Amino acid sequence: MAEKTQKSVKIAPGAVVCVESEIRGDVTIGPRTVIHPKARIIAEAGPIVIGEGNLIEEQALIINAYPDNITPDTEDPEPKPMIIGTNNVFEVGCYSQAMKMGDNNVIESKAYVGRNVILTSGCIIGACCNLNTFEVIPENTVIYGADCLRRVQTERPQPQTLQLDLLMKILPNYHHLKKTMKGSSTPVKN
């Protein structure tokens, strides 16, 4: 069983994925994406496509799970892909079920983003914020504080290119990495 699930993980050249991370199901990881040890990416209700230049930190959980009212044994639900854009940051211990996410978003530590939330681009979900509504979060929205207050920032968060470069250099020195795909077939950017 473990053999079969590992076969469907596609890692583009240039991505850094630590062996200690847990990746299950049909997952495609784009170039220049860094996945820390102990990060978990689980595709059980459909594939997960992760774009270019994303940073997924320790104990972050990205899961494409079945909705609570559907059990895969009794019904045969249509698999729905989870699409994650470019230059997103998933900080330590965050939980994301968002089925569609644009570019340059930050989900901070211990934040929770539910399945029915669509993040556009440039959004920041603050530490410990719980977002489980049926809505599309407008561009450049910041959600913060215990009451999940909202405001709009004037520009998008900067991509973490320097941090990604450093991690791509440092992580291979201290952790074993999962093998990338051969050839030049990289995932398509949405």
Curated annotation (Swiss-Prot):
Localization, UniProt: Cytoplasm, Cytoskeleton; Chromosome, Centromere, Kinetochore
Highest taxon in the source lineage: Eukaryota
Keyword terms: Centromere, Chromosome, Cytoplasm, Cytoskeleton, Kinetochore, Phosphoprotein
Gene3D superfamilies xref list: Hexapeptide repeat proteins
One cellular component (GO) term of this entry: cytoplasm
InterPro entries reported for this sequence: DCTN6, Trimer_LpxA-like_sf
Post-translational modification summary for this protein: Phosphorylation at Thr-186 by CDK1 during mitotic prometaphase creates a binding site for PLK1 that facilitates its recruitment to kinetochores.
Role summary: Part of the dynactin complex that activates the molecular motor dynein for ultra-processive transport along microtubules.
Subunit: Subunit of dynactin, a multiprotein complex part of a tripartite complex with dynein and a adapter, such as BICDL1, BICD2 or HOOK3. The dynactin complex is built around ACTR1A/ACTB filament and consists of an actin-related filament composed of a shoulder domain, a pointed end and a barbed end. Its length is defined by its flexible shoulder domain. The soulder is composed of 2 DCTN1 subunits, 4 DCTN2 and 2 DCTN3. The 4 DCNT2 (via N-terminus) bind the ACTR1A filament and act as molecular rulers to determine the length. The pointed end is important for binding dynein-dynactin cargo adapters.
Family (UniProt): Belongs to the dynactin subunits 5/6 family. Dynactin subunit 6 subfamily.
The protein, known as: Dynactin subunit 6
Native species: Pongo abelii (Sumatran orangutan)
Gene designation: DCTN6
